[in-house]
Amino acid sequence: MKIFLHGLDSSSRGTKAVFFRERFPDMLIPDFSGSLEERMQKLEGILSGRTGLRMVGSSFGGLMATLFAMQHEPRVERLVLLAPAVNFLGPSGYPEKPVSVPVWIYHGTHDEVIPLPAVKTVAGRIFPRLTLHEVEDDHNLHRTFRTLDWDTLLG
């Protein structure tokens, strides 16, 4: 089961969501609003009982995917995180137990919204199976996003 989690100021009608809807018609692409807690409660309801999850999270959606995987690791197959806001909680905001699913992060070297060094610090600690791609792009990853091999990334 594939799911895309959009960023804080985006929606299920954003550029990435539209791309995924066209490319993967069976992908879940819900809308989220409200606080992190409200968003996570909605995500819990949407994914209740589902397994084999291949989660794509963009920015704040990357944080959501990370938190979900920490709480439900056996149900998550892989994470693909795009400029994820994993620095939002700071290094001490995550449990000591790492998330052992495969994780791919694509992060722009010119990201002025979510600093790459902070993401590297947190992600390196919580994702032992991390593949980090630093790309010549900004936070939105407009130059990079469509060039990725999504069929391989999402298996």
Region locations from a protein language model:
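Short alpha-helix in the alpha/beta-hydrolase fold that links the catalytic acid
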Residues: 16-17, 115-124, 146
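Acidic catalytic loop of the alpha/beta-hydrolase fold
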Residues: 10-11, 87-88, 110-114, 139-140
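A conserved short beta-strand
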Residues: 74-87, 102
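Catalytic histidine-centered segment of alpha/beta-hydrolase-like enzymes
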Residues: 137-148
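Active-site catalytic motif of lipid deacylating hydrolases and related acyltransferases
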Residues: 1-51
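Gly/Ala-rich beta-loop-alpha elbow adjacent to hydrolase catalytic centers
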Residues: 57-66
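Short glycine-rich catalytic loops that host catalytic nucleophiles or stabilize transition states
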Residues: 30-32, 132-138
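Short beta-strand/loop motif that positions the catalytic acidic residue
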Residues: 99, 104-107, 111
